[in-house]
Amino acid sequence: MYHAAAGGATIVLAVLRFWILILVASAAPGQALYELSGRISPEGLASVTLFGATKPFSTSTLTDASGRFSFKKLEAATYTVAVFQPGRGEARQTIEVGPSLADAHHRIQLTITLRDADFDPASDRRRHSVTARELAIPESALRDYMDAQHDLEKHDVDAAEKHLEHAVQLAPQFAGAWNTLGTIAYQTRHFPLAELRFRQSLKQDPAAYEPLVNLGGVLVTLHKLDEALEVNVHATMTRPNDALANSQLGMTYFELGLFDSAVKYLERARQLDPAHFSHPQLYLAEIHLRRGEKAEAARVLEDFLQHHPDYPQAEIMRRNIVELRQ
């Protein structure tokens, strides 16, 4: 049995947890735009790509020799930063862009500290190898794919989708285009379509990781839990240090009512990427509340707000934390 405060917090958290799965953030008219000035540590040359975590967007740049990079005219949102360094592979980290982190001129300073364990070396090998199917992709389809990336940088989702659909018409084996189409469908809340597109991407390239982990996510959203468990276990075994795979496996166990296993993988995700856009802290807090562990619930909610200071329901969450501490 829960105390009233804990029970009320459980209801609020359940609502918040539900909405993070389907809410697509959008910029209000006249919303401030931000400049992100970042640095990779240890310093070195790298390519840096910024992906929208909750809506379709991507843009890329290169660092200078000291590891510095910048992105301008960014909307307030959650983003995934993907850093690729030759010889090391790719590492990903979630960042927040918003008023709490910016100065008076809407500039945000960021240092991304990366360890060797953060990089996926397989991504380096993939960039230096080309399959026969990829060699068969015509140049016109590749142009469509690149045009789609430029469309996403301009927030023109409809144009990006049209270019990608044309790309897969020209080259049905174009797994990367199918995966991007799936991501767009997921982020625009067309979940069954996202599932079909991720499956098509995997059909064309069964060894590809991105559509595998993305399929695992949409299966959780669609509550196809038996297959979600199978897919997300596979993803975590393929990349044990991927926060997304660990978080999704934790969510799957949560939905199955296997809370001990859920905590294991949600905590792992939180350690790997404390600001991760899947918000593992909200699931952890709900588990702690169901167990009557009010202090633990308050602790993970405070951790969540530390990494998401501009979260829309932050004030409600702060009141919940005060109640849980009483």
Located regions from the model:
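Short, ordered, surface-exposed loop/turn motifs in non-cytosolic proteins
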Residues: 34, 41-54, 126-128, 142
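Short, acidic Ser/Thr/Gly-rich low-complexity loop/linker segments typical of extracellular
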Residues: 54-68
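Structured interaction patches on ligand/partner-binding surfaces of diverse proteins
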Residues: 61, 86-109
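A short, solvent-exposed beta-strand micro-motif common in secreted/extracellular proteins
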Residues: 77-87
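Alpha-helical segment of the N-proximal tetratricopeptide repeat
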Residues: 133-176, 180-183, 187-193
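Helix-start (N-cap) detector for alpha-helical repeat units in TPR-like alpha-solenoids
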Residues: 141, 175-176, 209-210, 243-244, ...
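Canonical tetratricopeptide repeat
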Residues: 146, 180, 214, 248, ...
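Structural signature of tandem alpha-helical TPR/SEL1-like repeats
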Residues: 153-165, 187-200, 221-234, 256-268, ...
